[in-house]
Amino acid sequence: MNILLSRILKYLNGTLFLDDAYRFCVFFILHYQDFDSYTIEDISGELQTTPECILKFLKYLGFDNYLSFIEIYQRHKQVRFEQIQERMKNIHVSSYVERIKVSNDNEAFLKKIEEVYTKIHDSKRVILVGALYPMSIAVEFQTDLISFGKTVLQYHTYDKDMIFMKMTMLSLFLHQEDH
């Protein structure tokens, strides 16, 4: 299901412009858990833009108005949470590690996974940096973490505010190895 959050992330991750649409997407991610508590006027004031500029972007996403956007946000937020809950039932990380065979020492590999998990948990936000292909599959990772309240953004060199936000952050570098 191409939920609203993943559509926003696909736009945000792929855009080359620091414009009102980009700022709206970042605002959406930063305030995802309680986004429906904001009016379009609140958001336009915060972003120093107009409601019309926001509505123009929402029309680009296929929405006729802000209310329909909020209704889909609420529905998709609930659906995504239920999807994650269902996926996590009876999951055993060790069995996945056995099947993918990335290491000869599964215990050491599981320990590394736990270290990464702890770093993600302890950070206020996660910034993804990397090549196009690994970034394209990272949208699932982003939607899961954002759904649980963790801010996850892709790094864009043109967004100077991203570098200097005053919060604990973890940067993950994603790359593709040629074999």
Show the residue positions of the predicted features.
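N-terminal-biased segments
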Residues: 1-3, 145
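HTH-adjacent hinge/linker in prokaryotic transcriptional regulators
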Residues: 3-7, 15-26, 30-37, 41, ...
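Glycine-rich phosphate/diphosphate-binding loops that line cofactor/substrate pockets in enzymes
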Residues: 111-124
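Glycine-rich phosphate-binding loops that contact phosphosugars or nucleotide phosphates
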Residues: 121-179
